[in-house]
């Protein structure tokens, strides 16, 4: 779905960052959209990623990769049309790479964290900002929750159609996520 960007972070300090693999059992990423017939949802089932921490255990690098063919709606025809819209043979992954992070405290436990980075989606790369709620869990893991609205056409995707064009998918989608990195 997205081209894998070979450099995790553009600065040398990030390349020296401690890297923590994502815990897939508690990674949840869903795509929600609409059509002229009904709303639809797809769940990502193959998610990988890394979290980079500086010497103060603060986040300074994030890379998340989703296999396009792991997006499942429960409807094989819709799944196939989605994979075609992503041109999955050329763009097998969706990738988000952090370039900037800002944080403000919401409570003793939660912080509002704005993640800015490059999202590679169907072969196009766009800079996006995502507002998340983040926290360090009691076990020392890093949890980020949030959602981000996107338009398929911003990534040069043609929203899928079915039944000879009578069923049309809306351009807007929302990606919802709850991702925990092992600390």
Task: List the predicted regions and their residue ranges.
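Bacterial Sec-dependent N-terminal signal peptides
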Residues: 1-21
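Low-complexity, acidic/polar, glycine-enriched regions of mature
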Residues: 17-183
């Amino acid at each position: 779905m997205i081209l894998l960007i070979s450099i995790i972070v553009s600065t040398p300090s990030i390349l020296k960052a401690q890297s923590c693999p994502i815990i897939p059992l508690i990674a949840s990423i869903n795509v929600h959209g609409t059509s002229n017939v009904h709303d639809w949802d797809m769940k990502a089932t193959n998610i990988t990623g890394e979290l980079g921490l500086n010497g103060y255990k603060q986040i300074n690098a994030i890379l998340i990769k989703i296999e396009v063919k792991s997006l499942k709606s429960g409807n094989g025809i819709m799944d196939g049309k989605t994979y075609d819209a992503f041109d999955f043979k050329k763009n097998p992954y969706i990738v988000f790479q952090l370039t900037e992070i800002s944080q403000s405290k919401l409570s003793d436990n939660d912080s509002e964290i704005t993640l800015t980075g490059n999202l590679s989606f169907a072969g196009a790369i766009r800079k996006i900002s995502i507002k998340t709620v983040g926290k360090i869990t009691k076990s020392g893991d890093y949890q980020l929750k949030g959602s981000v609205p996107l338009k398929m056409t911003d990534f040069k995707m043609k929203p899928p159609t079915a039944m000879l064009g009578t069923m049309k998918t809306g351009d807007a989608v929302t990606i919802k996520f709850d991702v925990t990195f092992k600390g």
